[in-house]
Amino acid sequence: MNEYLLLLISTVLVNNFVLVKFLGLCPFMGVSSKLESAIGMSMATTFVLTLASILSYLVNQYLLLPFDLSYLRTMSFILVIAVVVQFTEMVVQKTSAALHRALGIYLPLITTNCAVLGVALLNVNEKHDFIQSAIFGFGAALGFSLVLILFSAMRERLAAADVPLPFKGGAIAMITAGLMSLAFMGFTGLVK
């Protein structure tokens, strides 16, 4: 139990996929201008990352490894991710049309979010079992969501602030992301 808790904490805080591994930067910068869309994207990405992590583990263990098809790992994981994203898009469209419109193109772009594929591939490389894969995927999703929501809240405050003209827009966003990354470096010694 303690091992699973450490894996979750390390994935969320210490080895955050956005701020430490620099994966998932496209939605991080693209959807973070409004808090409402960032929360929706966080929920969708959490669902996709967790489910894709679990399904990728199952595909790898029960299809690719027994038939010695490990060379198809990346392609099969992309296929799994695409199916999960399409399922998520259908669910979001049926349950909340406003959220579907707010997320726009970023919802189908979860398919190309390198963090989702990165989690699936890292599960294999780190030889996680089923429960560890689920926790790793969920932790990565929580870390992504935490950073996206915090960053979105800061960007909304910066939009109303008196920022010097050369720093408006993307420049101040990059500076803020860098400062967030430095803040998350403080968690480095938390988990070994």
Swiss-Prot record:
It holds the Pfam family Rnf-Nqr. Its EC number is 7.-.-.-. The chain crosses the membrane at residues 5-25, 39-59, 65-85, 102-122, 134-154, 171-191. GO terms for biological process: electron transport chain. Keywords: Cell inner membrane, Cell membrane, Electron transport, Membrane, Translocase, Transmembrane, Transmembrane helix, Transport. InterPro entries: Ion_transpt_RnfA/RsxA (IPR011293), NqrDE/RnfAE (IPR003667), NqrDE/RnfAE_oxidrdctase (IPR050133). GO terms for cellular component: plasma membrane. Part of a membrane-bound complex that couples electron transfer with translocation of ions across the membrane. This is Ion-translocating oxidoreductase complex subunit A. It comes from Shewanella baltica (strain OS223).
